[in-house]
Amino acid sequence: MAELVVALDFPAADVAVDMAGRLRGTAPWMKVGLELFCAAGPDVVRAVADLGFRVFLDLKFHDIPNTVRGAVRSAVRSGADMVNIHLMGGERMARAAVEGLHEGAQTTGSVPLLFGVTVLTSTAQGELPGISTDIGEYAASLAASGAAWGLNGVVCSGYEVESIKKRCGASFLCLTPGIRPGGGAGGDDQRRVMTPAQAVSAGSDYLVVGRPVTGAADPAAAARAIMAEMAAVRR
Amino acid sequence: MAELVVALDFPAADVAVDMAGRLRGTAPWMKVGLELFCAAGPDVVRAVADLGFRVFLDLKFHDIPNTVRGAVRSAVRSGADMVNIHLMGGERMARAAVEGLHEGAQTTGSVPLLFGVTVLTSTAQGELPGISTDIGEYAASLAASGAAWGLNGVVCSGYEVESIKKRCGASFLCLTPGIRPGGGAGGDDQRRVMTPAQAVSAGSDYLVVGRPVTGAADPAAAARAIMAEMAAVRR
């Protein structure tokens, strides 16, 4: 059953934690991204987890292997249930992240999910320096590498889920950002957006929604409506 | 005159701030990387800056443009004097980072330096998924893009400084990690290491040294010895 992840895209902890509080009893996951984490640090992860949510710490690590191993270890110890890395960082970095995941879990007692970023969903064909191959094919080949390197799944556009599942197996998880009830570009960076129903039909396991929930007049109602749309899709 | 940056590669704030305290009056810069920042958040940047150091917040942002803009803004507001992004993130992301830099500086009153990561110094030829061109050439072309997109400089191996300066001009700054007094691989990730004297001779503007200082019996003495070696090089 696909799960909803609400992106807490706020510049400060108080507003983010307040929003999470208003969403209790709706989506099971909250996402803490770079802007919020750079402003608030690991305390905001703990605060959101303490409200009963599972937390996706979306920092997209991309550094030398030893640093990524340490960063994942720290992220796990902060209470994150899901973390991610860039697969463009290569095999040694990815395997170091897997090691950091398990080292961190020795402190917390549970092993979080480790996702790989293939191609950012904001990236259009021709925008990847040095990469001339088809962007969908490049993303699928990175996903296959991620599966081979021991990751749990990948962040990818809804349009790539089917080919990734075919190539990496149904149990290899897909998390899809840029979900928009009613589809249509939201005027932000996401280039390849989908509706919740489309993404669930495509086979995505986690759907990330930001402004359409957190910017709604009644965020909890908006979240419940999206979850109802998701549940109505027969897979 | 090239400047020394000491990498505070520690898993917790107390140890890192203690080390910075022991290094007062030696290196002008301290570096806070992903592992320390994920454990401690922006408070550690302020604590190190309050000791009188300039702080390089080395998080290597690589996300959708809007998120990187917000992350750089938050990083600047935390008191960082230098931040960095991956140039593999492309032009839109890089230009969004430049916007975030100036937005953040409206709060702090000074515009930090924005550096681009070309190819991680831990990456060997053939390890970059989808990139078959020569790694030095790929790094130099990314550096040229970074200069065109408005960055202050790039993180690069000492072996690439000359070609980058030739291509981007002497005022385009180069920061070189993996510096080792006496050279020789240090058993960690860095693949293309140099001595302080070699890096200064090559034209590098900032030299990053980690364990050779922070792991020394007398860190302050180790830092001073490296700075003396740097100063002795005639450019």
From Swiss-Prot, chains A, B:
EC number: 4.1.1.23
Pfam families cross-referenced by the UniProt entry: OMPdecase
Leader peptide range in chain numbering: none
Pathway(s): Pyrimidine metabolism; UMP biosynthesis via de novo pathway; UMP from orotate: step 2/2
Top-level taxonomic group: Bacteria
CDD domains per UniProt: OMP_decarboxylase_like
GO BP terms, alphabetized: 'de novo' pyrimidine nucleobase biosynthetic process; 'de novo' UMP biosynthetic process
GO terms for cellular component: cytosol
Keyword rRNA-binding set for record: no
GO molecular function, one term: orotidine-5'-phosphate decarboxylase activity
Active site: 60 (proton donor)
SMART domains associated with the record: OMPdecase
Keywords: Decarboxylase, Lyase, Pyrimidine biosynthesis
First-level EC class: lyase
Quaternary structure annotation from Swiss-Prot or TrEMBL: Homodimer.
Role of this protein: Catalyzes the decarboxylation of orotidine 5'-monophosphate (OMP) to uridine 5'-monophosphate (UMP).
Name this protein carries in UniProt: Orotidine 5'-phosphate decarboxylase
Source organism of the structure: Nitratidesulfovibrio vulgaris (strain ATCC 29579 / DSM 644 / CCUG 34227 / NCIMB 8303 / VKM B-1760 / Hildenborough) (Desulfovibrio vulgaris)
Source organism phylogeny: Bacteria, Pseudomonadati, Thermodesulfobacteriota, Desulfovibrionia, Desulfovibrionales
Gene: pyrF
